Every structure is written in structure tokens, then in C-alpha cells.
């Protein structure tokens, strides 16, 4: 999805779910609790199922690759900006925290492509974002559409409430605030799942994104939904989950 938090028409990417900041010395312990998995979701746009998305987390040492592949269904090509065909985020989880290394996204056409590279020695993130050159200072709070998801899971596995995040948007960053919003039992094809709900919102924005994270499945999101006032813009609903 594109523009997960605040843009009309959809999400920033299936990979992008909520905020993260660099963790302290407990991050490595949290990384031991992360587990590779594959999950599929139905992408629902204005009440219509328009995509099937596959989310995969893979590990090589302290490096994690988080990928999302979306296939259009029905009129899904109209919503390719909401559910991009491919997104790949590479991060390292170390005793210094969650460190994004690179991010790539194909948004359905060349003008929607994103490619970011992180240089932690120079504290710079560079690349291109939908045709805009990116050259930004790199701080622990800066994340991309993929690294935020791993940050969320690491925070929750440590029993922390995720903090605010600065998410890259072209050659700038936007700050989003989110809070815990209760608990709920969600019916899924795999059975009922207990979830913790978080909501995210940019200051003064009418859009709110909510995330239902399964507490007994490593806090993997089983539902994500964005609303503008009372109007549901889009929803992701989990269909299958295989976790190592």
C-alpha cells in the first residue's frame, strides 16, 4: 500500500504498519524473538477486494528482509497505488537497535518507484522517491515503509508501547503519533485471534489508521484499516499465516 497513514486513496505500503524508534540495549534480545513468517492478506478498497498481498519476513544472521508482493484482483489495477506490486525492506537488528539498510518499492508505474539507501557512518539516507531526489540526515527515528513494521514487532515483543515515528516522504519526513486503542478478538480463516489495537494519526489529519496485532503470533497484524472521519478508505484482512 502507498501512503499508509495520511494520503487519500490508500496506504504507504503493506510493509508500513506503525512507528518505531531505535531501541536500546535490549534490542538484540528482542531480535531473538522475531521469527520468519509468511502471511497473505486480502486488500479491500472502498468495499471491494482488489488485491491479494503476500508478506514475508526472512532472516540471514542479524539481517532481516521484509517483502510484500501484491497481485491485483478484479478492478485492482485501479488501486495499484494503494497496493504496490513489490516492496522490499532490508534492516539489521543489533544491540544498537533496528537499523534500516535499504528500501525499494515499485508503485505500479515508474513514477511511483522508491529506492532508498542508508549510510549509518555518514548518517545520511539517499536515493529517489517517486521522481524526487532524496538526501536527508539519518537519525534513529527516521524509518521507511518497511522498517517500521519490524520496529513495531520488536517494541511489542519487549512489552513497550511503540513511540512516534518520522517516516520518509519524498525528500522530507513526517511525524506520526499513535496510541494504544484497546483489545479485540478478530475472526480469521485460522480461527479467532486476540489482538491489541493501535491507532496512528498525523497532527490535524482527519485520517486514522488502526492496526489489530495478534498478541500470541509475535504481534503480526491481522487487520489494518484506514478511515477518514466515518468513511472506511481501505482494509487489509489476513487470510493465512505460516510462522517458524
Regions found by a protein language model. Give the residues of each.
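Bacterial N-terminal signal peptides that target proteins for export
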Residues: 2-16
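Acidic, serine/threonine-rich low-complexity disordered tracts
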Residues: 31-120, 156-244
Amino acid at each position: 500500500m502507498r501512503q499508509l497513514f495520511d494520503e487519500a486513496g490508500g496506504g504507504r505500503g503493506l510493509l508500513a504498519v506503525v512507528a518505531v524508534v531505535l531501541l536500546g540495549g535490549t534490542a538484540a534480545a528482542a531480535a531473538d524473538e522475531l521469527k520468519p513468517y509468511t502471511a497473505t492478506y486480502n486488500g479491500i478498497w472502498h468495499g471491494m477486494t482488489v488485491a491479494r498481498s503476500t508478506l514475508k519476513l526472512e532472516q540471514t544472521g542479524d539481517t532481516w528482509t521484509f517483502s510484500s508482493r501484491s497481485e491485483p484482483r478484479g478492478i485492482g489495477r485501479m488501486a495499484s497505488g494503494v497496493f504496490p506490486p513489490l516492496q522490499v525492506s532490508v534492516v539489521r537488528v543489533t544491540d544498537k537497535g533496528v537499523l534500516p539498510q535499504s528500501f525499494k518499492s515499485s508503485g505500479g508505474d515508474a513514477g511511483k518507484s522508491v529506492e532508498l539507501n542508508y549510510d549509518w557512518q555518514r548518517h545520511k539516507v539517499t536515493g529517489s522517491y517517486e521522481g524526487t531526489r532524496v538526501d536527508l540526515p539519518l537519525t534513529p527515528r527516521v524509518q521507511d515503509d518497511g522498517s517500521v513494521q519490524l520496529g513495531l514487532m520488536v517494541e511489542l515483543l519487549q512489552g513497550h508501547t511503540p513511540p512516534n515515528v518520522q517516516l520518509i516522504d519524498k525528500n522530507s519526513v513526517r511525524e506520526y503519533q499513535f496510541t494504544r486503542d484497546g483489545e479485540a478478538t478478530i475472526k480469521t480463516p485460522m480461527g479467532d485471534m486476540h489482538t491489541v489495537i493501535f491507532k496512528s494519526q498525523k497532527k490535524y489529519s482527519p485520517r486514522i489508521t488502526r492496526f489489530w496485532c495478534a498478541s500470541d503470533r509475535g504481534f503480526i497484524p491481522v487487520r489494518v484499516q484506514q478511515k477518514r472521519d466515518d468513511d472506511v478508505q481501505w482494509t487489509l484482512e489476513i487470510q493465512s499465516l505460516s510462522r517458524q
